């Protein structure tokens, strides 16, 4: 009996210590995540806005070619390995793959948020992307991400990011022309509906519609879509994809998705697995090559 009492006493003393050790481990893991994020941020090079080359002729992006691009975050294993693909005006290409394979990072590199470890990105067949100022480049492209930013303001403000009455009228005409009006007419005050933290709480699909209208209103030469229809219902998604197909003669489109049905509508598919392009071709070519498991 005495031995059992001693064991119970020792156990009662060990349990609080074990709990403290578990809490300490949680704090260490949280600190590690914070350190990795700060290390990644501190390792980023400052953006340069100076134009290195004479780019007076860059009035329109006719094509973009990614050539053997590789990338890794500081202190981590390689995320993208020898990625090569191209897109030109009049095309919608698709980067197809599961979450975590590097699709989103590829678009972030194209937006100049990250610099590739190796490889080149060429614009209009001959211009190195690094020779174009970041500011100028971003006036030529537009993007829609899976996580949409809705600003405090009206629906109009969120689309045009301006306040002039003249531009407001242009936005309304734009939305009618492109078919967004049928989605926005259900908002309580239509285009004057207040959105954001102090406004109407809209669904994820509606947020993506706002973001897509915002991107297309900029009239970009290159449109980057990162799971941009993932929160939409099937009917809305199909209508939006058909809209994009009808607009592609005016611009190039890169669609990032894990949805097979969305990928089938693109002109060309690049399948990414573990940071590598493992298959590429039109949907029809992938089927003929017995690679239909990808589509």
Regions found by a protein language model. Give the residues of each.
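Pre-NBD coupling/linker segments of ABC/ABC-like ATPases
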Residues: 47-59
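An intracellular "coupling" helix at the cytosolic face of ABC transporter transmembrane type-1 domains
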Residues: 23, 27-30, 47, 70-75
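Conserved catalytic core of two-component sensor histidine kinases
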Residues: 8, 15, 138
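Conserved E/DxxT/N motif and adjacent residues on the DHp alpha2 helix
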Residues: 40, 47, 160
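ABC-type nucleotide-binding domain
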Residues: 58-295
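Membrane-water interface of transmembrane alpha-helices in multipass transporters/channels
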Residues: 1-7
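Flexible, glycine-biased helix-capping/connector loops in cytosolic signal-transduction modules
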Residues: 44-47, 189
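Cytosolic ends of transmembrane helices, especially the final helix of ABC transmembrane type-1 domains
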Residues: 13-41
């Amino acid at each position: 009996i005495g031995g059992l009492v001693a064991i119970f006493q020792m156990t009662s003393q060990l349990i609080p210590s074990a709990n403290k050790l578990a809490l300490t481990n949680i704090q260490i893991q949280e600190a590690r995540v914070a350190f990795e994020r700060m290390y990644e941020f501190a390792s980023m090079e400052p953006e340069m806005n100076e134009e290195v080359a004479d780019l007076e002729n860059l009035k329109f992006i006719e094509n973009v070619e990614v050539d053997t691009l590789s990338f890794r975050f500081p202190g981590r294993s390689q995320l993208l390995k020898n990625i090569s693909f191209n897109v030109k005006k009049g095309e919608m290409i698709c980067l197809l793959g599961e979450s975590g394979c590097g699709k989103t990072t590829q678009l972030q590199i194209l937006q100049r948020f990250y610099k590739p470890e190796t490889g080149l990105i060429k614009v209009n067949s001959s211009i190195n992307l690094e020779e174009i100022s970041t500011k100028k480049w971003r006036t030529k492209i537009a993007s829609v991400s899976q996580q949409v930013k809705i600003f405090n303001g009206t629906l109009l403000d969120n689309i045009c990011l301006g306040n002039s009455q003249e531009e407001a009228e242009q936005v309304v005409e734009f939305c009618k022309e492109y078919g967004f009006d049928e989605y926005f007419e259900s908002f309580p005050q239509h285009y004057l509906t207040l959105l954001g933290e102090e406004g109407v709480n809209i669904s994820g699909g509606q947020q993506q519609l706002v973001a897509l209208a915002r991107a297309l209103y900029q009239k970009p030469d290159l449109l980057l879509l990162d799971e941009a229809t993932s929160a939409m219902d099937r009917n809305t998604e199909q209508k939006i994809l058909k809209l994009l197909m009808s607009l592609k003669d005016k611009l190039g489109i890169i669609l990032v998705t894990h949805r097979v049905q969305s990928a089938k509508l693109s002109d060309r598919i690049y399948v990414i697995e573990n940071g590598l392009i493992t298959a590429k071709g039109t949907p029809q070519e992938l089927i003929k090559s017995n690679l239909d498991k990808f589509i």
